[in-house]
Regions:
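Extreme N-terminus of proteins, especially the signal/transit-peptide cleavage junction
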Residues: 1-3, 346-347
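N-terminal Rossmann-like or analogous alpha/beta NTP/dinucleotide-binding catalytic cores
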Residues: 2-139, 257, 296-298, 306
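A generic structural motif
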Residues: 11, 149-150, 208
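Internal, conserved structured core segments that host functional sites
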Residues: 111-115, 119-169, 173, 194-195
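Conserved nucleotide- and phosphate/pyrophosphate-binding catalytic cores
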Residues: 157, 163-354
Length: 354
């Protein structure tokens, strides 16, 4: 069986470092591993419209921004098909058929759906499209026969629901769909990066992000304003590293070579943490180190993004070519689905002989 990846993002804004450590860096690593036969990276504009129906221009404008972030991070159009979800109408038809296999109660139990409904204040009035987006996600995954789906930890319930839909379809109509496996980041600190305020997951809508495209001075300003241990009032006070966003970010981004270059008095992050915990290490020094680490990571991404910003016509061609490949793949899956459901009437010679 071919090894196929499907993953993507909603174009509701520029991508941030939470996206990067949560899945983007892993996608680039998987892309360059040579272990996968096909890779599909979806800009999920149709899904973004489920809670932005009155602001389509916001979604439209951010498609290019997300594509630029993808290319800046190292996604290679020679190896990965980057495409626009709404330009593959087969996905909508698959969603419609899968809706018949899922109950309202099951979608309501999905922890990710419950969390996002609350976050968007949709409790009193939930758009049907938004409520059904786990089913749409299952259509996206199965349309490309994805065997592996790199996502953040918060998307685990969505993958479980997708697997249920695959199992139900194959049970009712015969073996047709491919069951996917989830791919989580190998760095556990990357699974859920908090916002700079420390109280919530990094989110564009909450305004607590460090964007991949932020200029160097903006990144520094955000890092120096980050939440730390509120009880670490003086340098000599012992500090907590658990739940401390600065150390969570260091867990996600720092490597041994960063200490050699930027903070040679410490061998590694464990030594830095131990000093902070026993007291005598100030937050400013730790934040300055984090800034150096993140500038080293984000600097090359910024430069590549600026290069692609001068080549937007090429980005357009990349999206168009990737979408054509994606549509061909999805159409083949839809053909198989319709055959299994026996609704391929004009291709079935037995239709008149029942």
């Amino acid at each position: 069986m071919s090894k196929i990846i499907l993953t993507g993002d909603r174009p509701t804004g520029r991508l941030h470092v939470g996206h990067y450590v949560g899945s983007l860096a892993e996608r680039v690593k998987l892309q360059n591993s040579g272990l996968y036969d096909e890779i599909y990276i979806m800009i999920a504009d149709a899904q973004a419209l489920t809670d932005n129906a009155e602001h389509p221009e916001k979604v439209r404008q951010n498609i290019l921004q997300v594509a630029l972030d993808y290319l800046a991070c190292g996604l290679d159009p020679e190896k990965s098909n980057i495409f626009i979800q709404s330009m593959v109408p087969e996905l909508t038809e698959l969603t419609f058929y899968y809706m018949n296999l899922v109950t309202v109660a099951r979608v309501q139990r999905n922890p990710t759906v419950k969390s996002e409904i609350k976050q968007r204040n949709f409790e009193a009035s939930i758009p049907v499209g938004f409520f059904c987006y786990p089913i749409s996600q299952a259509a996206d995954i199965t349309a490309f026969r994805a065997t592996h789906v790199p996502v953040g930890e918060d998307q685990l319930p969505m993958l479980e629901q997708c697997k249920e839909i695959v199992h139900k379809f194959n049970t009712v109509y015969g073996e047709t769909l491919t069951e996917p496996e989830i791919v989580l980041s190998s760095n556990k600190a990357c699974l859920r990066l908090p916002g700079i305020g420390g109280k919530a997951k990094m989110s564009k809508s909450l305004g607590n992000c460090i964007y991949l495209s932020d200029e160097e001075d903006v990144v520094k300003k955000k890092i120096m304003s980050m939440f730390t241990d509120p009880n670490h009032l003086r340098v000599q006070d012992p500090g907590r590293v658990e739940g401390n966003p600065v150390f969570i970010y260091l867990d996600a981004f720092s490597r041994p070579e960063h200490f050699e270059e930027f903070l040679p008095e410490y061998q590694n992050l464990d030594e830095l943490k131990a000093h902070y915990q026993r007291g005598g290490l100030g937050d400013v020094k730790v934040k300055k180190f984090l800034n150096n680490v993140m500038q080293a990571e984000l600097g090359p991404i910024r430069e590549r993004r600026k290069m692609w910003e001068q080549r937007t016509a090429d980005v357009f061609d990349i999206l168009k070519a990737g979408t054509e490949v994606a549509r061909e793949k999805a159409a083949a899956t839809l053909h198989d689905v319709r055959s299994s459901m026996r609704i391929n009437y004009f291709e079935d010679q037995d239709f008149l002989n029942q």
